[in-house]
């Protein structure tokens, strides 16, 4: 280990930055956030330094480097564009046993600045020891996506409860189990983020009054239409925290690779026209695993509340008193249309969009008269097997036979394929496509020739 990671208490302590440009400004911002009493020494200053000085946040010393400014300092940063000046700052600091950072010159520095993930009071620092700042930045960005923005609020609130926890729970084991429940409670975290004091207090009292045995819960997560990059940050956080993930065929392998490695996985294989596991049995799997005290993620393609039967699954949990929450996802209509160059609405062609299931309960019938109306876009989910009927009904109820149509197979994935034509060809086009696929009907489909971007990459 070439560098010892430490966190410095700089509040109300003298620090010096030599340099008045953009790099110095970024370093100054960090030191000011840490509460340092800051002096900045440079020949010239960018405007932000003058703003800070006028607000009394720091002291500016205009002119060449003055090493006597180091005499009262705890820490220094050399951030000029002159290597000779930077080395002088480093040498002067070294002779006074003051830690000094030299920007872009780690070998000349006695300390280096890490990439920081700030969820104060929780802080995470990432460093490559100065060998690869870009790698450190990329790792920081990845960690940023994994750590919720409200984590700092949760940590601060935990600090307020420490005395009460210590008083109520006699052993370290009991306290540990309480904190484990506390920090994974999504309802508490969301209430803190929303500054909902009433909900925070209610959830806190429930945590203190419940048995310490972990209470199970279910999180319904929308995985999006295929591309793993379209999974939401909150969705990623949830699958990283799951004890067990119950998923179906529409969830891509790339997304499943993001699931916590030691989480159990249950494949239920749902797709239109074929249910590897009946819906009622899926409901019971969720209920059973949650009753064991597990954190269950039900991972569904697209958005769980748009033709995903998510509402039915949650009704079962609600009836049994199992806590649940929902993380929405990008629905297939939005993702597939965007990746196909087909805007769902357009000022000239469509003032509304309808999401329609082509997979009806026995005896069900759609409102074909309204579906055949002008100036709208229709998106049919699970409609491949009914494509010929959709074609026949729309024409029978007045839709023009030359209405553009598109079928998007494996939308947003590297296997995406789009076939398009006009309404009179819909039944025939459906024979060329395999599930999962989406049917889009409307004048906006004609824009695909101009707006298609994904297949060109």
Swiss-Prot record:
Q: What is its EC number?
A: 2.1.1.107, 1.3.1.76, 4.99.1.4
Q: Cite the InterPro entries for this sequence.
A: 4pyrrol_Mease, 4pyrrol_Methylase_sf, 4pyrrole_Mease_sub1, 4pyrrole_Mease_sub2, CobA/CysG_C, NAD(P)-bd_dom_sf, Siro_Cobalamin_biosynth, Sirohaem_synt_dimer_dom_sf
At which positions is S-adenosyl-L-methionine bound?
225, 301-303, 306, 331-332, 382, 411
Name of this chain's protein: Siroheme synthase
- Give the residues the record marks as binding NAD(+): 22-23, 43-44
GO MF term set:
NAD binding; precorrin-2 dehydrogenase activity; sirohydrochlorin ferrochelatase activity; uroporphyrin-III C-methyltransferase activity
Lineage, top ranks = Bacteria, Pseudomonadati, Pseudomonadota, Gammaproteobacteria, Enterobacterales
- Where is the stretch described as Precorrin-2 dehydrogenase /sirohydrochlorin ferrochelatase? 1-204
PROSITE patterns in the record: SUMT_1, SUMT_2
**Which species does the entry assign this protein to?**
Salmonella paratyphi A (strain AKU_12601)
Provide the gene name from the record. Answer: cysG
């Amino acid at each position: 280990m070439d560098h010892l990671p430490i966190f410095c208490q700089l509040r109300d302590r003298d620090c010096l930055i030599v340099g008045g440009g953009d790099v110095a400004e970024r370093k100054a911002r960090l030191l000011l956030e840490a509460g340092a009493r800051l002096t900045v020494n440079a020949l010239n200053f960018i405007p932000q330094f003058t703003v800070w000085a006028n607000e009394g946040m720091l002291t500016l010393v205009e002119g060449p480097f003055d090493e006597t400014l180091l005499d009262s300092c705890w820490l220094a940063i050399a951030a000029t564009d002159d290597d000779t000046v930077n080395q002088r700052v480093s040498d002067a600091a070294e002779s006074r046993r003051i830690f000094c950072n030299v920007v872009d010159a780690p070998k000349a520095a006695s300390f280096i600045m890490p990439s920081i993930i700030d969820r104060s009071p929780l802080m995470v620092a990432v460093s490559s020891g100065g060998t690869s700042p870009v790698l450190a930045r990329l790792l920081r960005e990845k960690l940023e996506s994994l750590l919720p923005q409200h984590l700092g609020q949760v940590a601060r609130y935990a600090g307020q409860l420490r005395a009460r926890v210590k008083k109520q729970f006699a052993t370290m084991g009991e306290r540990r189990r309480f904190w484990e429940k506390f920090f994974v409670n999504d309802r508490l975290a969301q209430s803190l983020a929303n500054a909902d004091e009433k909900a925070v207090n209610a959830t806190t009292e429930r945590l203190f009054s419940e048995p310490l045995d972990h209470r199970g819960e279910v999180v319904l997560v929308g995985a999006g239409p295929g591309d793993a990059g379209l999974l939401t940050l909150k969705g990623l956080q949830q699958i990283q925290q799951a004890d067990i993930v119950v998923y179906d065929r529409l969830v891509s392998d790339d997304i499943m690779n993001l699931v916590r490695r030691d989480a159990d996985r249950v494949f239920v294989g749902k797709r239109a026209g074929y249910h590897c596991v009946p819906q009622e049995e899926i409901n019971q799997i969720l209920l059973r695993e949650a009753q064991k005290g597990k954190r269950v993620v039900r991972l569904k393609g697209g958005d769980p509340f748009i033709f995903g039967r998510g509402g039915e699954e949650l009704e079962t949990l609600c009836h049994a008193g199992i806590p649940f929450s929902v993380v929405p996802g990008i629905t297939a209509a939005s993702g597939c249309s965007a990746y196909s160059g087909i805007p769902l609405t357009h000022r000239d062609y469509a003032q509304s969009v309808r999401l329609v299931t082509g997979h009806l309960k026995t005896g069900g019938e759609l409102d074909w008269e309204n579906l055949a109306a002008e100036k709208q876009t229709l998106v049919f989910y699970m409609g491949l097997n009914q494509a010929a009927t959709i074609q026949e009904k729309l024409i029978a109820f007045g839709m023009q036979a030359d209405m553009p149509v598109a079928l998007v197979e494996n939308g947003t994935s590297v296997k995406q394929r789009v076939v398009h034509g006009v309404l009179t060809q819909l039944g025939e086009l459906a024979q060329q496509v395999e599930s999962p696929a989406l049917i889009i009907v409307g004048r906006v489909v004609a824009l695909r020739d101009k707006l298609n971007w994904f297949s060109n990459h």
